[in-house]
UniProtKB/Swiss-Prot annotation:
InterPro entries: 4-PPantetheinyl_Trfase_dom (IPR008278), 4-PPantetheinyl_Trfase_dom_sf (IPR037143), ACPS (IPR002582), Ppantetheine-prot_Trfase_dom (IPR004568). Its main location: cytoplasm. It is found in: Cytoplasm. It comes from Staphylococcus haemolyticus (strain JCSC1435). Belongs to the P-Pant transferase superfamily. AcpS family. This is Holo-[acyl-carrier-protein] synthase. GO terms for molecular function: holo-[acyl-carrier-protein] synthase activity; magnesium ion binding. The gene is acpS.
Length: 119
């Protein structure tokens, strides 16, 4: 049974400006330790910003699908988005099957999340 659907679109330039001011502080606020390792594995700043923007959008979309938004119930660090063996983005969250799609262009990153309740 579908619990919720969430979508988020963010300008990569918005994340870039925040990253230029906050650097690792922003990365540590948004990404889990596993995600942070992947972030630091990228060579180019462009790819790092695409990744950070995509994960930001995914976590926002997830919180919308959950119906709570980010804050008291769920925080950025509570949501770990990883890639499976084929590169598909995945989130494990207790009690739910989570479907994730992330895309980006030169200027935007977008993510859609669908939550299904486990039987």
């Amino acid at each position: 049974m579908i619990h919720g659907i969430g979508i988020d679109l963010i300008e990569i330039d918005r994340i870039k400006k925040a990253f230029e001011k906050q650097k690792d502080k922003l990365v540590k606020r948004i990404l889990t330790q596993e995600e942070e390792q992947q972030f630091h594995s990228f060579k180019s700043e462009k790819r790092k910003l695409e990744f950070l923007s995509g994960r930001f959008a995914t976590k926002e979309a997830f919180s919308k699908a959950l119906g709570t938004g980010l804050g008291k119930t769920v925080a950025f660090k509570d949501i770990n988005c990883y890639n499976d063996i084929k590169g598909k983005p995945c989130i494990d969250y207790n009690g739910f099957i989570v479907h994730v799609s992330i895309t980006h262009t030169e200027h935007y990153a977008m993510s859609q999340v669908l939550l299904e309740k486990r039987d």
